[in-house]
Amino acid sequence: MSIQELSTEQEVEMITCVIDGFEVTVPKGTLVIRAAEKLGIQIPRFCDHPLLEPAGACRQCLVDIEINGRAFPKPQASCTIPVEKGMVVKTQLTSPVADKAQKGIMELLLINHPLDCPVCDKGGECPLQNQAMSNGRSESRFEGEKRVFEKPIAISSQVLLDRERCVLCARCTRFSEQIAGDPFITLNERGALQQVGIYEDEPFDSYYSGNTVQICPVGALTGTSYRFRARPFDLISTNSACEHCASGCAMRTDVRRGKTLRRLAGEDSEVNEEWNCDKGRWAFKYEVAKNRITKPLIRDENGQLQEASWPEALAAAAAGLKDAKVGVLVGGRVTVEDAYGYSKFARVALSTNNIDFRARTHSREELDFLASTPTTATYKDIDKADHVVLINFEPEDESPIVFLRIYKQFKKRAIKVSSIASFTSRSTQKLKAKLIKTAAGAEVAAINSITGLSEKSVVLVGERAAETPGALSAVAKLINTSGAKLGWIPRRAGEVGALAAGAVPDLLPGNRPIDNASARVDIATVWGSDSLPTTTGMSTLEIINSDLEAVVVGGVDPMDISPDAKVKLAKKFIVSFEIRQSDITEIAQVVFPVATVVEKSGSFMDWQGKVRKFEAAVEQSLNRSDVRILSMLADEIGKPINLPTVKAARNEFESIGNWDGQIAAMKTAIPLEVKSVKADEAILSSWRNLLDKGSLQDGEENLAGTARQSVVVISQSRASSLSVKESDLVRVSNDYGAVTLPCVIEDIDDSSVHLPRNSLGSQLFRNLGVVSNSIVKVAKA
């Protein structure tokens, strides 16, 4: 536990000790090494990490200690001993004994350590390198041959191990077991033969494996994609935010010559602490994809997209939008500033409320829920919760850092976790969650059955709850009656910010209801507009199915919405804002190239509503942000929105503030009757795996190598009726198509079958035309 965490506890006992002649007062339980840090005294260490349990493995942090005049007989590891009253500590700075002990440990660590510094990825930012200079001998007394191993060993497609570099600090193994709950990497053998390894025939299967690379102090673990690519002093580092989910991770982006070479987890004690998932760490090659769009495109008379100048493209887009009935599909990946730009552009330049960010399965009930039931939970509430309820939410796959925070409390105090799902997943198994087993579409009864929640309880709801009529109404009722805190956690990083920016058909920026005159006056005043459209607009699916003549599309994959979305959109005049060629650009009349996250400044809003600002990491990029292009397009239409820069959009949005007026109560939706199935049928359940066929993961072969195998999950009862055993092929089909995959037998609801939603061999909209809560046939392949 860190000093900061200890200090937040009420009535913590404080203890004063002396370190190198200086008094320091710290909370009871503070480790000596942490108390020294408070004085600015740096004790060398390798195994110590403030977020891992003490191990005392490397022995590099030895210091002289005496308590009430009685000295320890030999130097002690300062990373394992808590401060006590009357304690006097002498570090290497004041004690020759401690200094000699540290030099001796360093000499032993270097006996077999290779001279890889000129080529090692850790060179230039290596604690061993630095501390060998500051706390080691100037010459080695060892004259024998150094131990060598085969190098490197791939413990996964993403992580490589150089065993001779390892100092056995056990940071990687402790992280895997204590933080991620994935004990697939371990210390093998004993004594001089001890080394890091993985279990036989089991690769390092973890969504968080990249953190072991980052916290390794000596370059024993390296990332495949970064190995031998650059030196730290070649890189320009920029603090950034992750664009892959709503967790809100702080990040660091390292760029060389205008190209991103690596990304690291940033430090934010309130959000991701010092961790991130492998998707956030390694999924960035889409920025330099071969099909990247760098110039505006216009479809010519022959139906071919041709490069055009910006004035030509703006004129063509304006001509197609100016007098048409228009909708705006924003997508869930945009920054807050860009979402605000789309929101203002729709209302001012196009005079419509036909705008929606939900590029996924959605419902009108969800709009009512989001407008009337605000998120009140935070990460801190999870840290203090007595009970966490997961509803249509798979934390490890849909918001990995939320899983880590829940798991931390489970390890610390066995927090109670309940999950409404069709079966116990890998992550809920690690949390020892109570499964409220239900088929997809039958969640309402399960939600209504939950009792015993308090104001300290936290209910976390995923975006998939919108797929079951009545589920979100039941959640709202549960929150209102129990007093529990609510967290709505969508998958994509931009959705919470887009909601706040008013990129929905029934809300203006700041969660102001469209049908409230005072709310419209608030926004019209800021925007300098005489009036705003007053009727609730169309949702994403309604826009696609409508007779609208034109649609502005910002980074939307039509296969995330419905199987025939592309065909229906192709009949309309499409203006596309895209990073690279896609299904939408294939049917667009005008395509504008937009900047990626590393090429522009902006912000995301995480699931708890915290704004995560970032600056451009690749400043020499010529690509423009969405909001800047929208502002130019509005000028061309003749209805300016006056948002020429990201900063202008941010300042205007922040000046608006949140709505403090009346909020309409949620309209209760009527749940559907639970489906009944025949013997050869099942109700389809699905969600997206963290590592799947998502477009932002394209080109990441090493990352794809650790994606979990696509399987059909069936019950033992169904396996018996089909006469199949584990790993046999099972065919799931309907009138649209079929998916055939190996089966896994789990304690799943007997009427259900589960498939990954968008993984290799199981892209449900493409294969089956549905994603969940539908009846399918199940047979032995």
Feature map (PLM): residue ranges:
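Short, glycine-/polar-rich solvent-exposed loops and beta-turns at beta-strand/coil boundaries
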Residues: 48-57, 190, 646, 726, ...
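Short acidic (Asp/Glu) and glycine-rich catalytic loops that position anionic groups and cofactors
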Residues: 41, 82-87, 191-195, 293-297, ...
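Structural alpha-beta junctions
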Residues: 347-355, 410-416, 475-488, 570-573
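A cross-kingdom feature strongest in bacterial/archaeal respiratory oxidoreductases
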Residues: 2, 43, 343, 386, ...
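N-terminal single-stranded DNA-binding subdomain of primase/primase-helicase replication proteins
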Residues: 58-81
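Short, charged, surface-exposed secondary-structure boundary motifs
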Residues: 365-368, 428-430, 444-449, 497-498, ...
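N-terminal export/assembly segments and adjacent metallocofactor-ligating motifs
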Residues: 2-37, 45-49, 65-72, 86-449, ...
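A glycine-rich, hydrophobic/aromatic-adjacent loop/helix-cap motif
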Residues: 458, 463-538, 685
